[in-house]
Amino acid sequence: IEKVAQLSPSCVIWNGDASNTEETIEAQMRIYLQPKIERKDYAARLPYLFCPGNHDERGMANRHLERIWMYRQQDERPSRDWDLGRNFAVRMGDIAMVGLDTGEDKLDADKRFAGLFNNEAYRVAQAEWLRDALQQPEIASAPFLVAFCHIPLYDPRPNLNPGDVLPEDAGDKYTADYAGWQRTCAQLWTPMLEQAGCQIIITAHQHRYRYDAPDETRPWAQIVGGGPIMGFVGEGEKRREAPDRFPTVIEGSVKDGRLQVVVHNCVTGLVQDSFSYAARKVKKVKPPPRPLPR
């Protein structure tokens, strides 16, 4: 919060896992509206946008997050997409920002969910919304396109669970029984983002900062933001330093016609990394005609 206040950005994207299996609206209020922090101007002067994480899907209260965190207005999208209020496509200056919800980190058929989730259809519905959102004049004409979602859409490690395999079918191939990255979402969404010229996708979930540069398999970069651990793991005698575990604030701005991205390490207070991206090729899009006055 202090770093965000220091940077004083035009808006803030909160990239998920703010909560964990919340059952009451009072618990949500303590997290989102009345957090126990020293700064009392939290979210009072800066607009916040929220990309839910997998933990924000769990619990009775989290099924109705809109009671605390206002969903996008229905009049900005067709009736087909009214239930997709957690998605956003907005523009700040020369930067278009798209927010997607990767949902849970396990398959709907996973026995642990007892049939309570329908994320697979939800992700497909978001693909339909994304196709239209990328064609909106204010989005299509922006020199820079940045996408946000909680679970990464790429990972270089072959033994990391891609989220589309049931535990009983995985055998010993993967190191965990939950998704470390989201292959299904990548297959649904990234072809459209690539076609639109998206320069970077900013994700979270893994609790360790990582940068995935563009390569021959994908033209977009990916930043995996750090987690909540402040440089140490373990307790008591087992407590040890973990310099690779730190929260991050990822700052974006346009300078000299390029998108400048700076990754701030919230443990050291130093800049962890910085990157620069050229503008994408955009088509001049004519705004839709205004309706005639009645």
What feature does the model see in each segment?
Residues 1-26:
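N-terminal active-site segment of His-dependent metallophosphoesterases
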Residues 10, 143-145, 199:
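Conserved acidic residues
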Residues 16-17, 53-54, 150, 204-205:
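Active-site glycine-centered loops adjacent to acidic/histidine catalytic or metal-binding residues
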